[in-house]
Amino acid sequence: MKLISYYNQTDQLEQAAILVGSMAYDLNLLDKELPPTMAEFLFGEDETMVLAKAYDAQIKAGNKVRATPKPIQSLALLAPVPHPPSLRDAYAFRQHVAAGRRNRGLDMIPEFDEFPVFYFSNHHAINGPGDIAVMPDHLHQLDFELEIAAVIGWAGYNIRAEEADDFIAGFIVMNDF
């Protein structure tokens, strides 16, 4: 199942939708139990996910649904999760971290080899597809990175590795330059 968020220009609101092929189906028009925004959808946890997956399967099977599909090309796409409550970025590749530190005249951090290292990033600076606003004088200092982000959809504490998949709502392509 693919989920998107877009700006509904008619209602001037954010809208979450299921994407099937090149057509988007608004969640809350498919079923009144499904919320209109991605944040509300993720807060619904298992119940909203199960219901959305059922509608996704119905659409893919060719069954008629209540929501009128909209071509994705006609939508003003936002980031899939436009307003996450938190954004954490992990250092995953030693070679990349070492090169970045070396370029700044810094030694490699020993903690990298001892435990998973992450930092809190600015969750208020999330952008969807389109042009990136960058000051030209600083462009050469940016480190463009193609990453995959895991969207954690359910609350948890000290989650064991073998249970981690149960807390992931989905994945997003991300660039955190």
Task: Please provide the spans of the model-predicted regions.
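Active-site microenvironments in enzyme catalytic cores
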Residues: 1-8, 19, 43-177
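Low-complexity, small/basic-enriched stretches
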Residues: 1-40
